């Protein structure tokens, strides 16, 4: 992509937004003279206009004038031109890059109102519950003024509270709670228990953090533990016996593998002749995780060990881009257990994944998606290619006065820390507030100890002390304040400077290490110089920093003659730093792109499964689905009853025996009626007998109860087979790169295997459902456990490969409108139940 193609769309979008914003500003005086009721009436008129399928574009200026005036009347804040421009860009579904302190909270209320006019629900997504609370508290009085409702979602809410809040015109929520609620909604066994009403429009605050930094970490809901823990300890003990020559470690990809000598040791340790034999797949899996846990994951960097509420040591994951603890999250596929074994703390059994989704897949489900952040332009290509959003940099309301000093580069960390402390002492004596950014919890603790030695009072904000995040950052601009923060740097919380701090030079941001992304560094710099304030930034870097040790080892030799114990700042190192960061950014983008290529396969299957569940839960008569499943089962029974596979000659006795064993059980099926029939007549006759048999079951009860039992059986079978599918496909994906002998691209292998497994899933659901219906004898009981083991050759089923359309399932899948109408009906029922109670 050349420079012109990158810039032109941004300029075009920005110019369009600027023209609209200027029209809004021209009408300021006109709207000042409207009464409160007149503004409300105008807003209601637009809602009615849109309800008649008219576009908002024709009323966009009027809508912006209304909400701008209401914000002023409620909060005494008048939206600046740049805030209006940002709102317009987000309204059209693009990514607005707005610098820190430019008023994103107000901008988001503008655009939330614009989309709420459609009355379809707007999700305002941010990274933590503090920002949810701040955003909702600012928006609520404004939108209530216009008779719109605002909700907020927190993790401790019950189902009823969440449903009411999601049913508001605008709902503030965290990205994690949004994702988990989506997964939980697609695990319900009663449609009325869903809490979300659909995914129409999402605005993602801190969009780069959610859509880029967290893209590789899937949301996972786990089921019951599936295996013993002893093998994790054994694998960890083995790895701790290895010498450097027994394994290889690639610093760039952080991949680690056994060498030939390591494999020989593994064979002796685990008493096996061939380490790579298929029967050793579990050993290989656990040893691989133990290698990663011991050599690429470190306490204080990727995770910390902390106490839980019961005083037990636990592993808490650290978000690499923010430094925050990722509450409630754990590594999957056994890596969490490997780290627990390494740290010699209680090992939790590995749980089976019952539902999972990545943020990439989640947000691509929305009909309309937009985002806002202070830093995004360096990832513009990725946002366009993956999310179809153009990143547009919004001009600041006031010129930026921050001075970004050249980097200081040192040979080693010891010298770097010496100069950092010297700089802090000098600035602190002058009263200048200082924010020091570190790349890890470990570095923040080192700096804390060094500052204590020189008696400089300071605050520390890292994953061990994140509870006071907003409070610590809010005070970071006070006179003589010194604040140490990991990469989180209090995103979403303004650092306001006192008059004394401004006189002392404004906030100085000191970076103690370059991250692997220019965007993360820009986030740290951007804490200073907000809204035209003065400020400074400088990075102190050593050749021992992670960025160099992992990604620039080939270039370090060239730097030897340019370094000494003294500070160095040269064009050579600036170029080396920038090139290294670009290299890492490219690697990370390729990783995320690869992730979405793989995830696209599972995403399509997930969507089909979830829509089929909705169809079953909504429908009052699921026999049409049962009969399509029956068609597939009958085809398989007939296929196995052929005397010769390539001929239409059927062994009637074998067919009747199989049908009796799997469907009719002790009920009599007259095989004499089948003799003399042609191939297609046999199929028709068997289906008719099965349907008659099922109808006899239905006559033992009401149609409603029969459908309820049928639904329970179908949902239970779908969920059970989907869980197995997730487990198997995840293991295939983990090992697909080792299958080079097939001479196919790993992705192609994964697609082929996953498609075959999904066909098997559909066959298993069909067989289990049809066989279970045959077992029904009506009593009041839970039929979800009524799963039958079918007595057929599973390999023959797969060879026959008669695809169940969850095929024509496409014909029966409900539309979004149908789902919404059902949601509304169930919502009314829930309200009635609540009122009656």
UniProtKB/Swiss-Prot annotation:
Pfam families attached to this UniProt entry: P-loop_SecA (PF21090), SecA_DEAD (PF07517), SecA_PP_bind (PF01043), SecA_SW (PF07516)
SMART domains: SecA_DEAD (SM00957), SecA_PP_bind (SM00958)
Topology term for the membrane: Peripheral membrane protein
Keyword Magnesium among UniProt keywords: no
Keyword Transferase: no
Any single GO BP term: intracellular protein transmembrane transport
PROSITE patterns: SECA (PS01312), SECA_MOTOR_DEAD (PS51196)
Catalysed reactions, semicolon-separated: ATP + H2O + cellular proteinSide 1 = ADP + phosphate + cellular proteinSide 2
An annotated GO cellular component: cell envelope Sec protein transport complex
Subcellular location: Cell membrane; Cytoplasm
Keyword line: ATP-binding, Cell membrane, Cytoplasm, Membrane, Nucleotide-binding, Protein transport, Translocase, Translocation, Transport
EC number(s) reported in the record: 7.4.2.8
GO function term, MF aspect, one: protein-exporting ATPase activity
Binding residues annotated for ATP, in chain numbering: 83, 101-105, 494
SUPFAM superfamilies assigned: Helical scaffold and wing domains of SecA, P-loop containing nucleoside triphosphate hydrolases, Pre-protein crosslinking domain of SecA
Function: Part of the Sec protein translocase complex. Interacts with the SecYEG preprotein conducting channel. Has a central role in coupling the hydrolysis of ATP to the transfer of proteins into and across the cell membrane, serving as an ATP-driven molecular motor driving the stepwise translocation of polypeptide chains across the membrane.
UniProt similarity note: Belongs to the SecA family.
Quaternary structure annotation from Swiss-Prot or TrEMBL: Monomer and homodimer. Part of the essential Sec protein translocation apparatus which comprises SecA, SecYEG and auxiliary proteins SecDF. Other proteins may also be involved.
Protein name: Protein translocase subunit SecA
Provenance organism: Ureaplasma parvum serovar 3 (strain ATCC 700970)
Taxonomic lineage from the root: Bacteria, Bacillati, Mycoplasmatota, Mycoplasmoidales, Mycoplasmoidaceae
Gene name linked to the record: secA
């Amino acid at each position: 992509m050349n420079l012109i193609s990158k810039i032109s769309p941004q300029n075009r979008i920005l110019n369009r937004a600027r023209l609209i914003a200027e029209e809004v500003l021209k009408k300021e005086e006109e709207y000042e003279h409207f009464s409160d009721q007149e503004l409300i009436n105008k807003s209601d008129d637009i809602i009615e206009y849109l309800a008649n399928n008219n576009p908002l574009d024709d009323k966009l200026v009027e809508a912006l004038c209304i909400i701008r005036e209401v914000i002023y009347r409620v909060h005494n804040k008048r939206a600046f031109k740049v805030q209006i421009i940002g709102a317009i860009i987000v309204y059209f579904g693009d990514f607005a890059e707005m610098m820190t302190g430019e008023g994103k909270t107000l901008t988001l209320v503008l655009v939330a109102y614009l989309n709420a006019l459609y009355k379809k629900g707007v999700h305002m997504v941010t990274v933590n519950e503090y920002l949810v609370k701040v955003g909702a508290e600012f928006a609520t009085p404004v939108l209530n003024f216009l008779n719109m409702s605002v909700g907020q979602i927190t993790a401790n809410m019950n189902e009823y509270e969440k449903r009411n809040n999601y049913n508001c015109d605008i709902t503030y929520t965290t990205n994690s709670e949004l994702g988990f609620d989506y997964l939980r909604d697609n695990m319900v066994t009663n449609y009325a228990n869903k809490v979300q009403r659909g995914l129409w429009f999402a605005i993602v605050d801190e969009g780069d953090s959610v859509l880029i930094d967290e893209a590789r970490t899937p949301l996972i809901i786990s089921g019951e533990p599936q295996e013993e823990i002893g093998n994790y300890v054994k694998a960890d003990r083995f790895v701790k016996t290895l010498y450097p020559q027994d394994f290889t470690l690639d610093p760039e990809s952080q991949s680690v593998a056994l060498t030939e000598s390591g494999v020989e040791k593994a064979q002796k340790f685990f008493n096996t002749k061939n380490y790579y034999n298929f029967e050793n797949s579990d050993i290989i899996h656990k040893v691989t995780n133990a290698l990663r846990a011991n050599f690429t994951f470190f306490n204080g960097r990727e995770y910390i060990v902390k106490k839980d509420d019961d005083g037990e040591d636990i592993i808490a994951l650290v978000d690499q881009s923010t430094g925050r603890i990722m509450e409630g999250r754990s590594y999957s596929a056994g890596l969490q257990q490997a780290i627990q074994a390494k740290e010699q703390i209680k090992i939790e059994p590995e749980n089976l994944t019952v539902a999972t989704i990545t943020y990439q897949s989640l947000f691509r489900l929305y009909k309309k998606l937009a985002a806002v952040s202070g830093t995004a332009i360096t990832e513009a290509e990725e946002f366009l290619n993956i999310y179809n959003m153009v990143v547009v940099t919004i001009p600041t309301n006031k010129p930026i006065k921050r001075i970004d000093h050249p980097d200081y580069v040192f040979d080693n960390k010891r010298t770097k820390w010496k100069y950092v402390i010297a700089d802090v002492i000098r600035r602190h004596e002058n009263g200048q507030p200082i924010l020091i950014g570190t790349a890890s919890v470990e570095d923040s603790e080192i700096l804390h100890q060094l500052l204590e030695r020189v008696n400089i009072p300071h605050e520390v904000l890292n994953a061990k002390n994140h509870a006071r995040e907003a409070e610590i950052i809010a005070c970071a601009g006070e006179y003589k304040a010194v604040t140490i923060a990991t990469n989180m740097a209090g995103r979403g919380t303004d650092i306001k400077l006192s008059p004394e701090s401004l006189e002392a030079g404004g906030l100085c941001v000191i970076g103690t290490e370059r991250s692997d992304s220019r965007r993360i560094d820009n986030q740290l710099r951007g804490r200073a110089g907000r809204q035209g304030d003065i400020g400074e930034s400088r990075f102190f870097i050593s050749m021992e920093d992670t960025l160099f040790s992992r990604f620039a080892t080939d270039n370090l030799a060239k730097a030897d003659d340019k370094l000494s114990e003294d500070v160095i700042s040269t064009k050579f190192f600036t170029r080396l730093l920038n090139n290294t960061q670009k290299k890492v950014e490219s690697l990370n983008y390729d990783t995320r792109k690869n992730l979405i290529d793989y995830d696209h396969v599972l995403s399509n299957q997930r969507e089909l499964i979830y829509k089929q569940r909705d169809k079953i839960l909504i429908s009052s008569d699921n026999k049409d689905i049962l009969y399509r499943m029956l068609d597939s089962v009958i085809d398989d029974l007939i296929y196995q009853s052929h005397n010769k596979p390539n001929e239409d000659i059927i062994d009637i006795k074998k067919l009747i025996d199989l049908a009796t064993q799997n469907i009719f059980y002790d009920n009599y099926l007259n095989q004499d009626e089948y003799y003399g029939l042609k191939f297609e007549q046999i199929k028709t006759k068997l289906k008719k007998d099965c349907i008659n048999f099922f109808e006899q079951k239905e006559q033992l009860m009401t149609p409603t109860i029969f459908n309820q039992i049928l639904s329970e059986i179908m949902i239970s079978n779908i969920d059970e087979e989907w869980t197995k599918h997730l487990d198997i496909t995840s293991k295939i994906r983990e090992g697909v790169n080792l299958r080079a002998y097939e001479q196919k691209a790993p992705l192609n292998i994964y697609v082929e295997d996953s498609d075959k497994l999904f066909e098997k899933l559909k066959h298993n659901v069909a067989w289990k459902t049809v066989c279970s219906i045959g077992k029904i004898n009506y009593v009041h009981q839970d039929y979800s456990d009524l799963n039958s083991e079918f007595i057929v050759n599973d390999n023959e089923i797969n060879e026959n490969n008669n695809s169940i359309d969850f095929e024509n399932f496409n014909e029966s899948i409900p539309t979004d409108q149908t789902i919404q109408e059902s949601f509304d009906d169930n919502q009314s029922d829930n309200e009635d139940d609540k009122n009656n109670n």
